[in-house]
Amino acid sequence: MGMYAGYYRISDAELEQLRQLEERALLKRVEELTEDETAETCDLDKMWDVLRAEVCDLDKMWDALHFVLTGDTLSDTADHDPLSEAVCGSDFLLTQEMHVGGIPARRVKEIAQALHEVDFAARLAALQMSDFAAAEIYPNIWDRPEEEDDIRAELQEC
């Protein structure tokens, strides 16, 4: 199992409805979103496409993507950091089983602009796999030198 990230475009009204749900209903609604086969998957060649797409699935690379974008772990990131919000959201709906984060529509343009200004390839190239390991970035795959090229390629696709 493990932790993974999926991204869905919903309206502010839908985000507010999610905020109002009890834990069991919230889990059910999120499950419905993840099983919606009519939603389009995003083009992962450019991260800012996440903000325009219906669905984006980063699987288990969300924490590594956050680290490349911000240089910090999620717990160390400053409030209102648009690059952090792009990965984790800003309005948090927590349950015992999952973290659900939302981004209000008013923040999307600023976050998209911040993503557009990032030289992701340069940031990724500046990091060593040992940097991810030292920061305890999930998933724990950073001690596999034979997979480094594949890991970097997967992160670049994010």
Predicted regions and their residues:
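Acidic (Asp/Glu-rich) sequence patches and key acidic residues
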Residues: 1-157
